[in-house]
């Protein structure tokens, strides 16, 4: 290591800091996405059993604590919160208009955006490591080789045995850059795949909840129109005497 020029050591030090930063980010993001996936799986199993009482999960405090990391639970909580807020203000939540359903959907969309932003936070650190790590390492190698050649020229000794150790040591910077970038690349792709799956689950869950809400509580004018239609039909069928 004594053959490594000081310039290369500076670059290697920067790469070591980048490596620790990327590994910390990878650990935190994998841990977070794993908790979200586990919570979402639990929420799906619980929500599948609610039937027509869509609000019953909200009253289970133990379940709320268990699902605090679930992105689907966050969508569910804001939707039920919107319903209960309207009910507390005197609105008839047994008959929801299309506008009310769209307002609830908009609130859930806002939470979904926040969850997606949380999932993608800090991924820029991995992206920077992937794109910048090899180039920073290459910069250290180039600077190290330049120093080796400059020292050789000043000494007047062109013996390959004198040059080779310095060049090999300078290449350590490139190796460090690749060591930073390659794990970050695999982790970035894996985390992106997980985030896409979680985002898809949120979109499906949002649509399912709003659809079931509309099925149970949506305002329908069909029952009011049906008697008039039936009356007209009966009048048409009445024989003239």
Regions found by a protein language model. Give the residues of each.
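Membrane-helix interfacial "entry" motifs
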Residues: 1-4, 66, 114, 158-169
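Residue-level signature of catalytic and energy-coupling elements of molecular machines
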Residues: 5, 23, 57-60, 76, ...
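Predominantly long cytosolic amphipathic alpha-helical stalk/bundle segments
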Residues: 38-135, 147-159, 186-241
């Amino acid at each position: 290591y004594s053959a490594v020029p000081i310039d290369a050591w500076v670059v290697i030090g920067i790469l070591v800091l980048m490596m620790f930063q990327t590994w910390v980010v990878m650990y935190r993001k994998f841990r977070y996405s794993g908790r979200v996936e586990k919570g979402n799986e639990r929420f799906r199993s619980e929500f599948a059993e609610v039937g027509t009482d869509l609000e019953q999960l909200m009253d289970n405090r133990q379940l709320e604590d268990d699902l605090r990391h679930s992105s689907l639970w966050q969508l569910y909580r804001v939707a039920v919160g919107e319903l209960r807020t309207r009910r507390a203000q005197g609105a008839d939540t047994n008959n929801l208009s299309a506008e009310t359903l769209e307002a609830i959907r908009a609130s859930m969309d806002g939470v979904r955006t926040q969850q997606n932003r949380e999932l993608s936070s800090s991924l820029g650190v991995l992206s920077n490591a992937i794109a910048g790590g090899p180039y920073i390492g290459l910069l250290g190698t180039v600077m190290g080789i330049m120093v080796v050649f400059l020292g050789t020229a000043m000494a007047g000794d062109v013996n390959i045995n004198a040059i080779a150790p310095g060049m090999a040591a300078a290449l350590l910077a490139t190796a460090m850059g690749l060591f930073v970038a390659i794990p970050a690349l695999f982790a970035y792709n894996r985390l992106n795949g997980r985030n896409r799956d979680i985002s898809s689950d949120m979109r499906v869950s949002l649509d399912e909840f709003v659809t079931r809400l509309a099925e149970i509580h949506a305002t329908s004018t069909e029952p009011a129109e049906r008697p008039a239609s039936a009356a007209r039909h009966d009048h048409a069928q009445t024989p003239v005497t």
